[in-house]
From Swiss-Prot:
Alphabetized SUPFAM superfamilies for the sequence: Troponin coil-coiled subunits
Chain's role: Troponin T is the tropomyosin-binding subunit of troponin, the thin filament regulatory complex which confers calcium-sensitivity to striated muscle actomyosin ATPase activity.
Known tissue expression: In fetal and adult fast skeletal muscles, with a higher level expression in fetal than in adult muscle.
Protein name (Swiss-Prot/TrEMBL): Troponin T, fast skeletal muscle
GO CC aspect terms: cytosol; troponin complex
Length: 269
């Protein structure tokens, strides 16, 4: 039998079952007793309705209905649907796994790119540091070379001075000795002024007073430093002005033909 014939037979059986159920319901309704509350209880005769005639399903001639075949086809259909659900589930699972693998690959790729960028950045920074170190070494070498050339020029100039060279060295040593003596005196004065700060035995109020006193002293020292700086600037300005006046006077005296006193060989004449 074909699938269409099997479905037709199934529909006929279903219609037959529905007709039987409707007939049973009608039969029950007909046989229900009608209760009437009156002075005299009389039971009416039950009226029976004619039952519908049931007709057997039409079976095609020459063919028999194989219910096992129908059941088998239903099972096969259910199995096919179940298999389709299983296949779709595994396909979705496979797709999720592929997406997860792709995501991990993207993460690893991004991590590798970031590491490469950091390596390139570190290499550029290292090259920059090396370049700065080379420039610094080159500048130091040039400065040392320039100082050596200046020293050589000074030595040549001093050697050309002849007899005045020894006196110049003596005066230079004398000035160096004076500077050393002045530095020692300064250290001695500072050592006398810089007294040890013993504040372990002081309380909170005395510490506050001591801090205030130190702050006032520091403030006064800053004022004195500023005043001395301004005084030094004025003195330098006065010296520069006097030197320019002396130079102008010497120029005028040379033009007039009168000898002028000048500094020759490090000595005033």
């Amino acid at each position: 039998m074909s699938d269409e014939e099997v479905e037709q037979v199934e529909e006929q059986y279903e219609e037959e079952e529905e007709a039987q159920e409707e007939a049973a319901e009608v039969h029950e309704e007909v046989h229900e007793p009608e209760e009437v509350q009156e002075d005299t209880a009389e039971e009416d005769a039950e009226e029976e309705k004619p039952r519908p005639k049931l007709t057997a399903p039409k079976i095609p001639e020459g063919e028999k209905v194989d219910f096992d075949d129908i059941q088998k086809k239903r099972q096969n259909k259910d199995l096919m649907e179940l298999q389709a659900l299983i296949d779709s589930h595994f396909e979705a699972r496979k797709k999720e796994e592929e997406e997860l693998v792709a995501l991990k690959e993207r993460i690893e790729k991004r991590r590798a790119e970031r590491a490469e960028q950091q390596r390139i950045r570190a290499e550029k920074e290292r090259e920059r540091q090396n370049r700065l170190a080379e420039e610094k070494a080159r500048r130091e070498e040039e400065d040392a070379k320039r100082r050596a050339e200046d020293d050589l020029k000074k030595k040549k100039a001093l050697s050309s001075m002849g007899a005045n060279y020894s006196s110049y060295l003596a005066k230079a040593d004398q000035k160096r000795g004076k500077k050393q003596t002045a530095r020692e005196m300064k250290k001695k004065i500072l050592a006398e002024r810089r007294k040890p700060l013993n504040i372990d035995h002081l309380g909170e109020d005395k510490l506050r007073d001591k801090a205030k006193e130190l702050w006032e002293t520091l403030h006064q020292l800053e004022i004195d430093k500023f005043e001395f700086g301004e005084k030094l600037k004025r003195q330098k300005y006065d010296i520069t002005t006097l030197r320019s006046r002396i130079d102008q006077a010497q120029k005028h005296s040379k033009k007039a033909g009168t000898p002028a006193k000048g500094k020759v060989g490090g000595r005033w004449k």
